[in-house]
């Protein structure tokens, strides 16, 4: 009996099988209680999601803070390794200046069309506000800047900036304007959308490029394309497939769209702009196309 007891309490050896071969757990959609009488299911889901967002806001803020602190610590340790060895610090570890004092005017204007506020949940509004601030940072730091305007700035996105991001002083941002006016130009304007077949070969000074300010995880197909068609604004797409392969969706964030256009003016080379701006996890360079596509870009 004692042997049986000892065996039952013996330490079970750890599973040494390759964890990569194990299937990932299925992430199921959150379950909400039945909606009260008089409230539709979609309205009730929005209410529940908003409530859950408010309840977990502080927790997520703490998680993001800890993640930033870990990244800072890892960077400091990496820098120390180079300095201890007396080696030059690589460019990718150097922080870019907050303001580029040697900027040139690209000659283009960019509009962030933020008229899709009602189609996003609260988390997506937070994400969009982050993308807008990143677009502003790019406009300060890149070698070329654009005149950027945020339109339809009058709902939750504005509340986000006025309440949670009030320290940003966004009303004083240089070359960056916020307006509640939803009007979009129809002359010398191009609406950029991945849903069109027309390819954007070059950026032309004097032209306004409109970017849809929406975070929707691809829920709303042809949203920007249909709006542009209704307003008789020409549509074009960045030449992503012609120069690179993207891992996953060929839909870029609003901030990446802005940074790519600004970076394009460095050498007027889309391939170089894509490879220098997009994170490696999204980028899959097709080396078989390199020679022909480089020639076509010149």
Swiss-Prot record:
Root EC class: transferase
Active-site residues, Swiss-Prot/TrEMBL: 216
Gene Ontology cellular component list: cytoplasm; nucleus
Annotated region described as Disordered, given as residue ranges: 1-44
Chief location category: cytoplasm
Residue numbers binding S-adenosyl-L-methionine: 192-193, 212, 216-220, 224, 238, 250-252
Protein location: Cytoplasm; Nucleus
Enzyme Commission code: 2.1.1.221
UniProt xrefs under InterPro entries: MT_TRM10-typ, MT_TRM10-typ_sf, TRM10/TRM10A, tRNA_m1G_MeTrfase_euk, tRNA_MeTrfase_TRMD/TRM10
BP GO annotations: tRNA N1-guanine methylation
SS bonds (residue pairs): none
Segments forming domain SAM-dependent MTase TRM10-type: 96-285
Role summary: S-adenosyl-L-methionine-dependent guanine N(1)-methyltransferase that catalyzes the formation of N(1)-methylguanine at position 9 (m1G9) in cytoplasmic tRNA.
Protein name (database record): tRNA (guanine(9)-N1)-methyltransferase
Name of the gene encoding the protein in the UniProt record: TRM10
């Amino acid at each position: 009996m004692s042997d049986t007891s000892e065996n039952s309490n013996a330490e079970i050896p750890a599973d040494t099988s390759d964890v990569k071969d194990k299937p990932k757990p299925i992430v199921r959609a959150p379950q909400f209680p039945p909606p009260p009488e008089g409230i539709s299911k979609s309205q009730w889901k929005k209410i529940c999601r908003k409530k859950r967002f408010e309840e977990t806001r502080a927790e997520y803020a703490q998680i993001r803070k800890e993640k930033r602190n870990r990244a800072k610590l890892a960077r400091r340790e990496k820098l120390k390794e180079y300095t201890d060895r007396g080696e030059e610090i690589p460019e990718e570890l150097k922080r870019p200046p907050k303001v580029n004092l040697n900027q040139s005017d690209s000659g283009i204007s960019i509009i962030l069309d933020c008229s899709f506020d009602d189609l996003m949940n609260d988390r997506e509004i937070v994400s969009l506000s982050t993308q807008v601030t990143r677009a502003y940072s790019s406009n300060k730091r890149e070698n070329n800047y654009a005149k950027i305007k945020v339109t339809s700035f009058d709902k939750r996105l504005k509340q986000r900036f006025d309440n949670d991001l009030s320290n940003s002083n966004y009303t004083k941002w240089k070359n960056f304007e916020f307006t509640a006016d939803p009007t979009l130009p129809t002359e010398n304007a191009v609406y950029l959308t991945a849903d069109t077949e027309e390819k954007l070969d070059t950026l032309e000074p004097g032209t306004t490029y409109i970017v849809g300010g929406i975070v929707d995880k691809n829920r709303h197909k042809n949203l920007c394309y249909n709006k542009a068609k209704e307003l008789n604004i020409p549509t074009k797409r960045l030449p992503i497939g012609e120069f690179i392969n993207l891992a996953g969706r060929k839909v870029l964030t609003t901030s990446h769209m802005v940074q790519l256009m600004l970076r394009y003016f460095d050498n007027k080379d889309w391939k170089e702009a894509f490879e220098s701006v997009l994170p490696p996890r999204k980028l899959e360079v097709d080396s078989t196309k390199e020679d022909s596509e480089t020639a076509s870009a010149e």
